[in-house]
UniProtKB/Swiss-Prot annotation:
Function: Core subunit of the mitochondrial membrane respiratory chain NADH dehydrogenase (Complex I) that is believed to belong to the minimal assembly required for catalysis. Complex I functions in the transfer of electrons from NADH to the respiratory chain. The immediate electron acceptor for the enzyme is believed to be ubiquinone. This is the largest subunit of complex I and it is a component of the iron-sulfur (IP) fragment of the enzyme. It may form part of the active site crevice where NADH is oxidized.
SUPFAM superfamilies membership: 2Fe-2S ferredoxin-like, 4Fe-4S ferredoxins, Formate dehydrogenase/DMSO reductase, domains 1-3
E.C. numbers: 7.1.1.2
Protein name as annotated: NADH-ubiquinone oxidoreductase 75 kDa subunit
Annotated residues for binding of [4Fe-4S] cluster 2: C153, C156, C159, C204
Similarity field: Belongs to the complex I 75 kDa subunit family.
Gene symbol of the encoding locus: nad11
Cofactor(s), names only, from the UniProt record: [2Fe-2S] cluster; [4Fe-4S] cluster
Domain (4Fe-4S His(Cys)3-ligated-type) ranges: 85-124
Residues annotated as binding [4Fe-4S] cluster 1: H101, C105, C108, C114
Span of domain 4Fe-4S Mo/W bis-MGD-type: 223-279
PROSITE patterns, alphabetized: 2FE2S_FER_2, 4FE4S_HC3, 4FE4S_MOW_BIS_MGD, COMPLEX1_75K_1, COMPLEX1_75K_2, COMPLEX1_75K_3
């Protein structure tokens, strides 16, 4: 039904069948601004603040625009948003909100981004009439990352609704009523155990919840935005680095409804403090180990001569392991280098997890389903994946699928194979061993009947499963297709590392990579154990905290967001979507080189123009193909009793950046050991 109505004498129309809008949404769609505090488009409607009051003809009282849906009753009605009655009501609402608000604006970190400040100027009174003592609320301890000065709180409940509805934790709530109403944890001094807790900082319209790491560091108008990505997650969430004077001050999300909506993880939001520590600890010149724990500095010319001597020695067998943050240009350069050396023994750091992988076809490692329409799935099966720590943003998309009101039926729709984790209460746990996976293929669980009945199932396969058994994703898809007639595109692979798909695109993978060489050439990679056969290590990267004392030759290189020649670089996520990042310069030493520059120098007889020409030709070639839907039958020896363990033990300490971030490290320890923070502990901490 087409509904016709007027907003401030402007004629509007809405198709009720296509659009389910409230008055506030209709006004916003027609370019009419209505002030609000509690309303947020990604959260349920609360109607707490009453700032969005509007007048509707034939209604006795003003209505809250955020909570009134447009239906057939509004046909030929008129809505007013700027009449004197409404303006006076807004002044009254603002006066009540400001009654207890402290005069912290000069020192508040929300300054310049404060909704309360802006709406007070636009809609508030110029004088205050409140003469009684203002109420003060004690500082709340929400952990090392979030500073809670709750005297500033206006009780919009955005933080409560986000944590409950989206993050899936019930640790914040509204306590008391009336004058004594507060927002806090149900238990005193309990930290918020969510990998996405930092998003309540962005949601808070006032300065009640702010970043403890950013406290008193800068003002938003001083900071420059530079596009980046969440390098810790294969989704490659778009972010903004906010920088000043070559230093990162904050990291904020960029809105992308197909990927992250407007959320980012705590790890990417707060890890940036580690870059300052790295710059203090790292050397800016090459160094060579002359004896245990004793290094001498070298010139780049001498260091590269030593590299050539080692790599060109025919007696040496070189293993090349490339870090998970290296971009596609550098992947191509070092693959070319190894090919010129006559070696095929190269792999990425995250590729070490897989015993077998068929990368002949792009559909085997790039997922065609981007989970934007995840609500259409009627069944979810997680195979060897802990979404809370492996991909928190995918976790919140999937855990909020509405399968219906029947709790028993809902439980039958969600299955988990692998280690248990706190994902969704109404789920069916099928076991933690490889044998459980085989039983699913054989249809020996009652849950398998649900899989067969499902019209739009979603199967997520994680690295934990493929790292345990020598079976490829293609074979898993074929098994599901034979057992339950599930289409291959409904079986998705969620890997670790930002460049896994790009590396497979370049053909950088070696099955059963043995690390059997005697020379290890590591490009910004240190998340693995060094093989006993290695007697010489060349480490080229930022800083190595895993096997630093074993390194023989160190070549300092730049961070991934500095390590490209042009001003922009493209990364490709697990769904095949391109994410653009801009160049960000924070390295202090002028002697530090880009990985690409070091690689070009090593390719002595291959100049840059030729490499650029090859790269351009590869980009222009378009190959159209169809995947082979062949149900291959072969015998595979599998230990059925192998446990599918999580590959991530501590979410907050997975790489050098997160390990060197003091606040992330302590947060990980606190959550792992379930310790309780003391109230106001952020005051005593040192933000590095």
């Amino acid at each position: 039904m087409l509904i016709r109505f007027k907003i401030n004498e402007i004629e509007c129309e809405v198709d009720e069948e296509k659009e389910d809008l409230t008055i506030l949404q209709a006004c916003t769609a027609n370019g009419i601004e209505i002030p609000r505090f509690c309303y947020h488009e990604k959260l349920t409607i609360a109607g707490n603040c009453r700032m969005c009051l509007v007048y509707v003809t034939n209604e006795e009282k003003l209505l809250a625009a955020c909570g009134i849906p447009l239906d057939e009753n509004f046909d030929d009605e008129s809505i007013e948003t700027e009449i004197d009655e409404i303006l006076k009501a807004r002044e009254g609402v603002m006066e009540f909100l400001l009654i207890n608000h402290p005069l912290d604006c000069p020192i508040c970190d929300q300054g310049g981004e404060c909704d309360l400040q802006e709406q007070t100027i636009a809609y508030g009174l110029d004088t205050g009439r409140f003469y009684i003592k203002k109420r003060a609320v004690e500082v709340k301890a929400f952990g090392r990352l979030i500073k809670g000065i709750m005297t500033r709180c206006i009780h919009c409940t955005r933080c409560v609704r986000f944590l409950t509805e989206i993050a899936g934790v019930n640790e914040l709530g509204v306590l008391g009523r009336g004058y004594n109403m507060e927002i806090g944890t149900y238990k005193k001094n309990v930290i918020i155990e969510s990998e996405l807790s930092g998003n309540i900082i962005d949601l808070c319209p006032v300065g009640a919840l702010t970043s403890a790491v950013y406290a008193y560091k800068g003002r938003p108008w001083e900071l420059k935005n530079i596009k980046g990505i969440d390098i810790f997650d294969t989704v490659l969430t778009p972010i903004n680095y906010q920088v000043k004077g070559g230093e990162i001050f904050r990291i904020l999300p960029r809105i992308n409804d197909r990927l992250n909506e407007e959320w980012i993880t705590d790890k990417v939001r707060f890890h940036y403090e580690s870059y300052k520590i790295i710059e203090k600890m790292r050397k800016d010149t090459p160094s060579y180990k002359i004896q245990a724990n004793k290094f001498i500095e070298l010139s780049w010319k001498t260091a590269l001569k030593m590299v050539f001597k080692v790599l060109l020695n025919k007696k040496n067998k070189v293993d090349l392991i490339i870090g998970s943050k290296i971009n596609s240009t550098n992947l191509r350069i070092y693959k070319e280098l190894m090919n010129r050396l006559g070696s095929k023994n190269y792999i990425t750091e995250n590729g070490l997890l897989f015993k077998k992988f068929n990368y002949d076809f792009r559909e085997n490692y790039i997922n065609s389903n981007d989970l934007y329409n995840v609500d259409q799935n009627d069944l979810v099966l997680l195979c060897g994946i802990n979404l809370r720590v492996e991909s928190p943003l995918l976790n919140i998309k999937l855990r909020n699928i509405n399968f219906g009101d029947d709790e028993i039926e809902t439980r039958k729709k969600i299955g988990i194979i692998g280690n248990k984790f706190d994902w969704k209460q109404e789920s069916e746990y099928l076991g933690s061993t490889v044998n459980s996976m085989l039983k699913v293929f054989e249809g020996r669980f009652p849950y398998c009947q649900q899989i067969k009945k499902s019209k739009a199932p979603l199967i997520l396969v994680g690295s934990s499963l493929l790292s345990r058994i020598a079976i490829s994703l293609q074979e898993i898809r074929a098994a599901f297709e034979i057992a339950s007639n599930i289409k291959p595109e409904n079986v998705l692979l969620i890997t670790q590392g930002a460049n896994f798909g790009m590396a497979l695109e370049e053909g950088i993978f070696k099955e059963n990579f043995s690390k059997g060489g005697n020379v290890l050439y590591s490009i910004d990679s240190n998340e693995y154990k060094v093989s006993k056969t290695i007697n010489y290590i060349i480490y080229q990267g930022i800083l190595n905290d895993t096997f630093e004392n074993k390194i023989d030759l160190y070549l300092p290189s730049k961070h991934y967001f500095e390590d490209f020649e042009s001003d922009r670089e493209i990364y490709v996520n697990t769904f095949g979507q391109r994410s653009e990042i801009e160049k960000l310069r924070i390295s202090k030493g002028n002697k530090i080189k880009e990985n690409s520059m070091i690689g070009y120098i090593q390719l002595m007889y291959l100049n840059k123009k030729e490499m650029n020409r090859k790269e351009k030709e590869q980009k222009e070639i378009k190959i159209t193909y169809r995947g082979i839907k062949q149900k291959e039958k072969r015998q595979v020896k599998i230990n059925k009793n192998l446990t599918i363990n999580n590959i991530i033990d501590n979410y907050y300490m997975t790489d050098i950046n997160s390990r060197l971030s003091k606040n992330l490290m302590i947060t990980g320890q606190l959550r792992k050991e379930k310790k309780i923070m003391e109230a106001g502990s952020w005051k005593n901490k040192t933000c590095i």
